[in-house]
Amino acid sequence: MARYLGPKCKLSRREGTDLFLKSGVKANDEKCKMNTAPGQHGARRARLSDYGLQLREKQKVRRMYGILEGQFKKYYVEASRRKGNTGATLLELLESRLDNVVYRMGFAATRAEARQLVVHKGIMVNGHTCNVPSAQVKAGDVVAVREKAKKQLRIQNAVELAKHRKELSWIDVNTDSLEGTMKSSPDRSELSADINEQLIIELYSK
């Protein structure tokens, strides 16, 4: 299955909420009509069944993190094997992805941009270059922008944009040296309240 390369607004409108797929330079609601589905005339949203709600929630989270179906299912399987709340563990695994951590630290304006930065070998983890977006970052790991990439305008712009986002307690970022430390596992209370991970668990556990 190929990665979606079409309009980002279309995905957000499909899910009826901002998936944070765009840089945030302009508010998404200026262009994306979240209260209507995609299409020339904005089709009315049908009332969903329980299964439909579960499926939509899964699609929303999968698209938010830019992950294909097969890989997303693997995250669920891994989360279900671990002790504790499966839904919270699933989100922890997603948030601990290297591309997401790069985005959370403010080195990229979007997760897609963060993924590209990682793939192009612009990021180091504990002093070593890592070009695997799905690599799991652990507490104590240091994530930094490589010296040769620090002058990229998109990174400088991303750092400025990140100043307007809420700071997260589980990461510590030095914007001068463009490096950050993952202090602890991601805290569910600081993640989007618009995510209902229990619906995803119900979908996969059938």
From Swiss-Prot:
GO cellular component term, pick one: small ribosomal subunit
Gene3D superfamilies: Ribosomal Protein S4 Delta 41, Chain A, domain 1 (1.10.1050.10), RNA-binding S4 domain (3.10.290.10)
Sorted UniProt keywords: Ribonucleoprotein, Ribosomal protein, RNA-binding, rRNA-binding
Domain S4 RNA-binding: 96-158
Source domain of life: Bacteria
Listed Pfam families: Ribosomal_S4, S4
rRNA processing found in the keyword field: no
Family of this protein: Belongs to the universal ribosomal protein uS4 family.
Self-association state and partner proteins as the record states: Part of the 30S ribosomal subunit. Contacts protein S5. The interaction surface between S4 and S5 is involved in control of translational fidelity.
Function field: One of the primary rRNA binding proteins, it binds directly to 16S rRNA where it nucleates assembly of the body of the 30S subunit.
Identification of the protein by name: Small ribosomal subunit protein uS4
